[in-house]
Amino acid sequence: MIDTYRNNVSRKRTELSKLSSDRAKESAKKAQQKQKIISATNSINRTNSQSIIRSKRSEIERAEKEIASIDKKIADLDRKIAQKETEIANEEKKVRTEEDKIRKKQEQEDKKRQKDNEKTLKEINQAISMQQRMQFDMQKDID
């Protein structure tokens, strides 16, 4: 059972890594779109041509829409990342709980084994004492 929990943690960490990677890619896309806006704005400021200004404003509008779309994807990825982190924490808790169960079971087995060993040793010592008494009594009868 503990191996299942450990495998789940490993798998979920891999999934979390992929989500984080996807988020980084979306952030890079957002930076590119912001750069497009800056470039188009600079072009607008340098020109007097109305057609270029309209074209650059359309470019800015498309970039802003793309940024809004990217922000939505990033928010979704952030939600998934938070959910995955919660799942990992839950699986790690299961691992710790299972490890505690195994440790407690091992401790109980060790205590039982120790108790059995002490009982056996006591029985052996009693048998030796009885044997010594019998030997002493026999020696006494012989003398």
Residue ranges of predicted features:
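Extended alpha-helical coiled-coil "stalk/arm" regions
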Residues: 22-62, 87-98, 102
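Generic ordered-secondary-structure signal
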Residues: 7, 43-44, 129, 143
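Short, charge-rich amphipathic alpha-helices with coiled-coil/heptad character
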Residues: 1-15
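Long, charged amphipathic alpha-helices with heptad-repeat/coiled-coil character
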Residues: 9, 16, 71-106
